[in-house]
Amino acid sequence: MAYQPPGKDNGAQSPNYNDSGHRLEDLPHGATYEEEASTGLLSHQQGGPFGGPFDDPHQRGTSPVRPTSGYSLTETYAPDAGFHDPYSTTGSVYSGNSAENPAAAFGVPGRVASPYARSETSSTEAWRQRQAPGGGGGGGLRRYATRKVKLVQGSVLSVDYPVPSAIQNAIQAKYRNDLEGGSEEFTHMRYTAATCDPNDFTLHNGYNLRPAMYNRHTELLIAITYYNEDKTLTARTLHGVMQNIRDIVNLKKSEFWNKGGPAWQKIVVALVFDGIDPCDKDTLDVLATIGIYQDGVMKRDVDGKETVAHIFEYTTQLSVTPNQQLIRPTDDGPTTLPPVQMMFCLKQKNSKKINSHRWLFNAFGRILNPEVCILLDAGTKPGQKSLLALWEGFYNDKDLGGACGEIHAMLGKGWKNLINPLVAAQNFEYKISNILDKPLESSFGYVSVLPGAFSAYRFRAIMGRPLEQYFHGDHTLSKQLGKKGIEGMNIFKKNMFLAEDRILCFELVAKAGSKWHLSYIKASKGETDVPEGVAEFISQRRRWLNGSFAAGLYSLMHFGRMYKSGHNIIRMFFLHIQMLYNVFNTILTWFSLASYWLTTTVIMDLVGTPSESNGNKGFPFGKSATPIINTIVKYVYLGLLLLQFILALGNRPKGSRFSYLTSFVVFGIIQIYVVVDALYLVVRAFTNSDAIDFVTDQGVGEFLKSFFSSSGAGIIIIALAATFGLYFVASFMYLDPWHMFTSFPAYMFVQSSYINVLNVYAFSNWHDVSWGTKGSDKADALPSATTTKEDGGKEAVIEEIDKPQADIDSQFEATVKRALTPYVPPVEKDEKSLDDSYKSFRTRLVTLWIFSNAFLAVCITSDGMDKFGFTNTATDRTSRFFQALLWSNAAVALVRFIGACWFLGKTGLMCCFARR
């Protein structure tokens, strides 16, 4: 229903939204998230006086015709605004590479070619040019009028900028007409240049945030941390968050959300971007489209004091889907997005995720004082009502300090990503963790890790020591903390902070005088993308494995601090049980390399070389061939394991993709071979009573003794039942068994590589703690802010450009065009760097040297080589080898002696005939 301005006759002609053009609207009732791709926005040329999304539907049917402006939208408000467009086409879809004029899709006159077009400059270079004062326009630089802005307390630059008319008009009338005392919440974006450390971002120092300025209680602070994700991944997370906020606002019978003001005013979304340099500039266009960012307003410094973070604030009802579809409210139906209070913090320099969390908790958290903080990584899509489920966990349990939901792998449409065995294996790993591990730890009250990609904390629970210990890993505090900071840490502590979320979990549960516990909330689900390539997978797991191992040891060594907490005796009893469980798991992890090798060899020996008494043949190649095959498999296994150390100690995974891929495949084949042998053992045990030397005719005691004998067959049967059987039973109990059929085989194929490749690489690179930052050369494109004094030198002011609304609107068109251009993933180059080439040659050289020597040693000394046609025994071969070696050394020594004698004789003879 179109909004009618006050005093307007309701019988007047309403804007026409029923055309087939670019409509900014939410999904139709009943539509699913995956169906958004069918909602075209750039499909056809606009028609009618209000055919474009940026035409103001709240203006009268006609408006005075202004002088022609290359970027003004107001001409399209006049129904007879004709013009000649040399690029005019009908019914075509704009693509970033076509020659058609994209302005036609918006009903805008033809204009001068922009120097910032994507075809002429890269998105990064075009972004740099747009940061110049007045440089956002497409027709070249021009002079604008200026206004004087006072600095808060003489040092804090905080300015309100008008948002484009299209964004203002997208806000529903019931919100725009209900402004609080002339609030500029929906009409202006607020920009603050923070020139301080996050700890100094306080009201006392002149900094403030809009929700606090409006005296609103913040119940839920939703934080999205970002590094360099593309606009599709960012939109997936942001649109999912806005849909979840809509779920909360639409609650009808809530005892909390419907009291004390609108529900949307109790929720704040904060996006924290880790540096201008790594940031994807197309993502900034998406944020500008919904109103939370504008080009050309950021300041590099204020009076020479460098800006640390650029903070934008706006309340919007717009959203962009991962398919680059722009969604806006059309009515008061349940699918309409409510207003969402947003903050966008763009850090000037890349200073790591832990510093982003310091901005979130120490800067924004202390001003907003939220009850619950939800942490998301860009790329994680929260499921329907997932954020509500997380919040309800805190609302219904006053002692809950932290919680996490179920994270599952993004499988794509029709689960097509499961074709990749690596994705399927990770899907199974995530599922089993959510079915077996997380519920167990939640029952104890201490979840060892709440994943930073999808977790929540009660803000007052983590205040104090938990956050203090957590932020010791922030390198920007190294000088301030001294020996307690990064510079004073040993390599063990630095690795510990690779899994800093584990540190926060332990500190929260062990907080002195408190009884906070952690929980897993299954009803809350989040979807995340997982590595699809071997190199990316190895690099990711290095940080996870090293960080979790160090943090696990930290929690065990500091378990005594639990006695200072306020937990009751029952909770402490279960925490002690969990500690013993963790100790046992740590020991198993430490010896996993040898355990896997021994398991593999024992199973192959049991099946391939059965005892003489039971009369079984070797499986699967017969009694004579199977031992030979098994011997080859063992040597290949050991050789590949040795290769992992060579690769891990000298190469980057991206520089050795083929070697690592080969290792995964060969280890997978060996694993399948061993699994087939193990299944054969089980089948033989239950089909032939004499097959594996079980005693079945002398009572239960003798049967159990033979079952658990050193032959190992009974133990293997129990192990198979306790793993495979347990997986199936637990999955069906949780009514989520599909991964057992779609992903379990792939997991079995990759499982041995988890131990033999990932663990070896992680421990071999224990020294790599990935600290350090990258400078931001992109910040050089930002202008500086210099103050002048007024009122006799009492007031510090700066001069700021005051753009006309028409120019703001026209520049916004170009922004939306860039934001809604279909995303084309960049082609990743697999070319090796020069350093990678040198390292690869070194690896091949060392590998050839080691394996050729090992092969010689095995051929000479191994008794097993008799099976390959060697007629003599290992003792005879060793004796003959030493004879050959001694004769060879003697021959070399003789040649060297002959050479020395020849040189001596020649030199003496030449002395007699040399000319003086």
From Swiss-Prot:
Mark out the compositionally biased spans (Polar residues): 60-75
Q: Give the induction note.
A: Expressed during exponential growth. The promoter contains one putative AbaA-binding site (CATTCC/T) and one sequence matching the consensus sequence recognized by AbaA and BrlA (C/AG/AAGGG/A).
Gene designation per UniProt: chsB
Q: Which residues form the signal peptide?
A: none
> Effect of gene disruption?
Exhibits hyperbranching and a lower level of conidiation. Leads to sensitivity to the chitin-binding reagent Calcofluor white (CFW).
Residues the record marks as carrying a glycan: N18, N546
Q: Keywords assigned by UniProt? A: Cell membrane, Cell wall biogenesis/degradation, Glycoprotein, Glycosyltransferase, Membrane, Transferase, Transmembrane, Transmembrane helix
Protein name listed in UniProt: Chitin synthase B
Highest classification ranks of the organism: Eukaryota, Fungi, Dikarya, Ascomycota, Pezizomycotina
* CDD domains noted in UniProt: Chitin_synth_C
**Where does it live in the cell?**
Cell membrane
Which biological process terms from the Gene Ontology are attached to this UniProt entry? Answer: cell wall organization; chitin biosynthetic process; hyphal growth
Q: Does the keyword Membrane apply?
A: yes
Reactions catalysed, as given in the entry: [(1->4)-N-acetyl-beta-D-glucosaminyl](n) + UDP-N-acetyl-alpha-D-glucosamine = [(1->4)-N-acetyl-beta-D-glucosaminyl](n+1) + UDP + H(+)
Q: Which domain of life is it from?
A: Eukaryota
The main place the protein resides is membrane
Broad class of enzyme this protein falls into: transferase
Q: What is this entry's stated membrane topology?
A: Multi-pass membrane protein
List its EC numbers.
Answer: 2.4.1.16
> Which stretches of sequence are listed as region Disordered?
1-84, 114-141
Q: Which organism is it from?
A: Aspergillus oryzae (strain ATCC 42149 / RIB 40) (Yellow koji mold)
Molecular function (Gene Ontology), one example: chitin synthase activity
